A protein has these predicted regions:
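Active-site-proximal structural scaffolding
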Residues: 10, 31, 42, 46, ...
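Active-site-adjacent structural elements in folded domains
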Residues: 22-24, 70-73
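Nucleotide-state sensing region of NTPase/ATPase domains
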Residues: 76-132
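Short helix/loop capping segments that flank catalytic or ligand/cofactor-binding pockets
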Residues: 26-27, 39-40, 46-48, 98-99, ...
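Charged catalytic cores and adjacent phosphate/nucleic-acid-binding surfaces used
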Residues: 1-43
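Extended, charged alpha-helical "arm/stalk" segments used for dimerization and assembly
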Residues: 116-158
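Generic beta-strand/beta-sheet core signal
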Residues: 20, 32, 38-41, 52, ...
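Phosphate-binding glycine-rich loops of NTP-binding sites
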Residues: 35-71
Length: 158
């Protein structure tokens, strides 16, 4: 990894996801600049991949807003990650590369291209924003005027 790469687009992107340990042991997925879809049969780890992304980026549902969903996802991650970890490679719109690593029960560790820890926050208020939707969430949005309007408002405020 170099200190900076030529930006391939004018937006931030997730370059790859790698899992060490657990159900997805050894998986490495490279992502394209645009829309990425995870497709596979029942029980192949699609939900686990999606939730691993959400977990590494510290974008889990709020425990105070949706406690039941938060706890269900924590159980899923603990069962599927075990003592393993998730690592993401991120590229900013300016072509700067970062890695984010996270194990269950820990906070995300962000490092620069040289592997040195940097003081960048991951999560809802970080400059590297991301929207991640499960199939059920997409169905909820499609079936609810309220969800559609709230998402459109949130996107228009950006």
């Amino acid at each position: 990894m170099t200190a900076s790469a030529k930006p391939s687009s004018r937006h931030h992107r997730i370059r790859s996801l790698e899992v060490t340990g657990g159900f997805l042991q050894g998986i490495k997925m490279d992502f394209s600049d645009g829309l990425n879809c995870v497709i596979g049969g029942r029980g192949t780890g699609k939900t686990t991949v999606l939730e691993a992304l959400r977990f590494a980026l510290d974008r889990m549902p709020s425990e105070t807003v949706d406690r039941r969903r938060h706890e269900a996802l924590e159980k899923l991650l603990q069962a599927n990650l075990g003592t393993g970890s998730v690592k993401l490679e991120l590229e900013t719109a300016d072509g700067i590369l970062y890695s984010v690593s996270r194990a269950f029960g820990e906070t995300p560790l962000v490092t620069n291209a040289d592997g040195k820890p940097v003081d960048i926050r991951i999560g809802n208020d970080m400059h590297f924003g991301v929207d991640i939707y499960s199939q059920n969430q997409i169905e909820d949005i499609a079936n609810s005027d309220y969800f559609q309007q709230s998402h459109l408002k949130a996107w228009s405020d950006e």
